[in-house]
Amino acid sequence: MSDNPVKEEVQQFDKKCLKKTNTAEKNTLPTKEDIDQEKKAAEGGK
């Protein structure tokens, strides 16, 4: 298994050549008001 060229390359990879990136939160959680509105809409539809 040690003769696998991909595994050898991964072990020799230098993390210093990676660039730092800033991540942006895309999936925000709903507010309490949003949840309440959805509950009221669901109850009204029954």
Curated annotation (Swiss-Prot):
Subcellular location: Cytoplasm, Cytoskeleton
Region of interest (Disordered), ranges: 21-46
Pfam families assigned to the protein according to its UniProt record, in alphabetical order: Thymosin
Biased composition regions of type Polar residues, renumbered to the chain: 21-30
GO biological process, one term: regulation of cell migration
InterPro entries noted in UniProt: Beta-thymosin, Beta-thymosin_sf
GO cellular component: cytoplasm; cytoskeleton
Residue ranges crossing the lipid bilayer per the database entry: none
GO molecular function: actin monomer binding
Keyword annotations of the record: Actin-binding, Cytoplasm, Cytoskeleton
Record's compositionally biased regions (Basic and acidic residues): 31-46
Similarity section: Belongs to the thymosin beta family.
Function per UniProt: Plays an important role in the organization of the cytoskeleton. Binds to and sequesters actin monomers (G actin) and therefore inhibits actin polymerization.
Protein name, UniProt field: Thymosin beta-a
Lineage: Eukaryota, Metazoa, Chordata, Craniata, Vertebrata
